[in-house]
């Protein structure tokens, strides 16, 4: 029995147990009508299942369950329909930004779902039990009804804007346009907060499944939402409390004037030019509001303590990294050492250190010391003997494991990930 990319958790499938295929198809049709994303794909999927439901309604399903040759295929068909319902329902309940970012993956799941349901339908010996031309014609029509699932052009443009942002594109405008359609009854800041909560849930699910690709996408989306959040609180507060606007403004104005008067070295405004100090303060505030990529994963590092998430012998899961480390170990080692020592280390410096320790036959001692510092930084259990044996038996595997662990935990140094500042504009 196939599973569709982490869809269909056992707890959710158990809630649908007891429903026959016809009732499950009805649930899918209702869920498709309320989908927030992939609406066209949900409608096509539901329309295809309507054809199957119309056929099953004419059969005595209770009678078919009495025979083992038809009972098992029916149960497999119902399991596939349950996962199909969870797929359609996820387009309503899961994070809108996550579904948008994983657009083509969801499209692939729709294609796989329809193919699996059709395959199980062919296993049911309907033609031998209900032998008439009308049923055969409808079966042939179902087989010919091969829907084409695709990603909507508008959603694709939004996905490109969020995942591959143009430095001159304001993410606030993009998010306001998309979230206003997804949350029509919520103000923008509430919708953004709700999306952040859902993204945190998606992040935990991806981390538990060790899905590095999804973790990076979700971390990027969280960085975008936090960057946008930092630009709207003052405006949203003024909209929600207009009666306090005058008093707050006068108080802030008085405090600002007082601080300007108390500073003897602060230059006065002359000839319509604002003082340089005020510009520096504004630029400092703008820079401090930016959220570095991967910040959330680093802040939640405590949840990963006391164990390695990357297997020592699992280096082949990243062939490119494995080959790069095999032929150029200094490059991977320098990145690991930069994080373990909290200071940047170039590949040349790492190569010099390794060659120097190799002259006294203690290269493994040096690299295992860096591994120990990395364990202490990431709060991973272990001992010096384990570190030494890991680098002695297979130094390449140990380096790949350490860098994969850094990627899983998002424990990049601040200089490893750089996010360009958002475009700024003046309000008149």
From Swiss-Prot:
This is Cell number regulator 13. The gene is CNR13. One of its GO terms (cellular component) is membrane. The lineage of its organism: Eukaryota, Viridiplantae, Streptophyta, Embryophyta, Tracheophyta. The keyword Membrane applies. It is a single-pass membrane protein. The chain crosses the membrane at residues 354-370. Residues 281-290 have a biased composition (Polar residues). It comes from Zea mays. It holds the Pfam family MCAfunc.
